[in-house]
């Protein structure tokens, strides 16, 4: 006979915050939040810049218990966006990377041998899903489209906002905590990878995709906004001259993305790559060398001349990988 777990409903949001004041978005929306955080609340990044549409989608997930998926290219800050919203709401947040080694047992739980009163006994230990389901936690599944099929069907049980989680091994039915929230990030929106960039991803059952009540896309930002983000993250580039340098860096990234879309490049610079490049430039004191070790060396050898040409167009400086230099070396 199934036993139902009646939760002690506590740890509910005890305040509300103004989206306009906290996130700088022009709306009258107010969102429930906690006045105090705990150990599971992400660290707050005071310089983080929010994308309007993505932020509103995530806030709707917190305020109205919507299941929200954030899709987009790598390095655009999908998971970080969710974390930084949670940080400002003081909402506990836990991320789980759905790589191919995460199994059903990891999510649901398993029998473990424990010592009680000096004796070894077998006891069921909840996995991350039952634990989060019973607490005021925002659970984020990263790389959602890389999850194994058996794992995905376990998750499907909890995608409905009032869905109950049945643990067959324990004959238990778990009701969700009213402040439990579920998010996911993905590169392919469950349709499979057509670019060749995301090996290991797969198509997601459309019956499951249909249960995600909000799907938002976070792709590459407009040039000036990306410059703002990089300059805010890397303090050494905040002056006018530094901002001009960052603008050239983002220009290189824009050129690689255009080449990728046209099919001329198989790799692409993400906003994360630009930030890493700026950080490495600050470490080495050499923008060209930092570019080489941050991105250029990751490119196919046959494509490096094109990437070096993008650098030359933005900075007006030739790298040794430029096609002209390669020809000169070959004829020398």
From Swiss-Prot:
Keywords: ATP-binding, Cobalamin biosynthesis, Cytoplasm, Ligase, Nucleotide-binding, Porphyrin biosynthesis. It comes from Sinorhizobium sp. It catalyses: hydrogenobyrinate a,c-diamide + Co(2+) + ATP + H2O = cob(II)yrinate a,c diamide + ADP + phosphate + 5 H(+). Catalyzes cobalt insertion in the corrin ring. Pathway: Cofactor biosynthesis; adenosylcobalamin biosynthesis; cob(II)yrinate a,c-diamide from precorrin-2 (aerobic route): step 10/10. InterPro entries: ATPase_dyneun-rel_AAA, CbbQ/NirQ/NorQ/GpvN, CobS_N_dom, P-loop_NTPase, PD_CobS. Heterotrimer of CobN, CobS and CobT. It holds the Pfam family AAA_5. Gene3D superfamilies: P-loop containing nucleotide triphosphate hydrolases (3.40.50.300). One of its GO terms (cellular component) is cytoplasm. Its main location: cytoplasm. GO terms for molecular function: ATP binding; ATP hydrolysis activity; cobaltochelatase activity. It comes from the Bacteria. This is Aerobic cobaltochelatase subunit CobS. One of its GO terms (biological process) is porphyrin-containing compound biosynthetic process. It is an enzyme of class 6 (ligase). It is found in: Cytoplasm. The keyword Cytoplasm applies. Its EC number is 6.6.1.2.
């Amino acid at each position: 006979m199934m036993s139902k777990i009646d939760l002690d409903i506590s740890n509910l949001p005890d305040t509300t915050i103004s989206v306009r004041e906290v996130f700088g978005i022009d709306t009258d929306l107010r969102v429930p939040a906690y006045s105090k955080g705990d150990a599971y609340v992400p660290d707050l990044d005071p310089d983080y810049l929010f994308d309007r549409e993505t932020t509103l989608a995530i806030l709707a997930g917190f305020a109205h218990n919507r299941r929200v998926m954030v899709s987009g290219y790598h390095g655009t800050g999908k998971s970080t966006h969710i974390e930084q919203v949670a940080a400002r709401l003081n909402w506990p947040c836990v991320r789980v990377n759905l790589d191919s080694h995460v199994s059903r047992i990891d999510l649901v739980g398993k029998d473990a041998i424990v010592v009680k009163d000096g004796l070894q006994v077998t006891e069921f230990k909840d996995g991350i899903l039952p634990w989060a389901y019973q607490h005021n936690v925002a659970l984020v599944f990263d790389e959602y489209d890389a999850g194994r099929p058996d794992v995905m069907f376990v998750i499907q049980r909890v995608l409905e906002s009032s869905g109950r989680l049945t643990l067959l091994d324990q004959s238990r039915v778990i009701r969700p905590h009213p402040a439990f929230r579920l998010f996911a990030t993905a590169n392919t929106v469950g349709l499979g990878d057509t670019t060749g960039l995301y090996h290991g991803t797969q198509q997601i059952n459309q019956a499951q995709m249909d249960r995600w009540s909000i799907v938002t896309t976070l792709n590459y930002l407009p040039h000036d906004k990306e410059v703002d983000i990089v300059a805010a993250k890397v303090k050494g580039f905040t002056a006018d001259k530094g901002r001009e340098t960052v603008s050239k860096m983002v220009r290189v990234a824009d050129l690689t993305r255009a080449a990728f879309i046209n099919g001329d490049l198989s790799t692409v610079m993400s906003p994360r790559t630009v930030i890493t490049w700026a950080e490495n430039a600050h470490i080495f004191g050499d923008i060209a060398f930092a570019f080489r070790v941050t991105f250029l060396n990751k490119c196919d050898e046959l494509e490096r001349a094109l990437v070096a040409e993008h650098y030359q167009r933005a900075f007006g400086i030739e790298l040794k990988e430029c096609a002209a230099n390669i020809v000169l070396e070959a004829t020398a």
